[in-house]
Amino acid sequence: MTPIEKTTDEILRLAAEHFKVPREQLSAGDDFFKKLGINSLQALDLLTRIEQHFHIELPDYELQGVSDFRTLAERIQSRL
């Protein structure tokens, strides 16, 4: 498993726990807004949890246009 795959898998696990959905229902290419039916405030709440988990802080400009788990994992991996 590559570092990106590990990070993506961990993000998917965190999202599933946070929104109480089965992990199997989520995949790397999913648009989290559509797949989880969440709004931007809920996405920020999830992002805060993810940042705390990975001990990083992602600037807003790095998150513009990010809506799928794989791209989010790539941004996070670039900070680790």
Place the predicted regions along the sequence by residue.
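Two-component histidine kinase catalytic core, primarily the HATPase_c
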Residues: 42
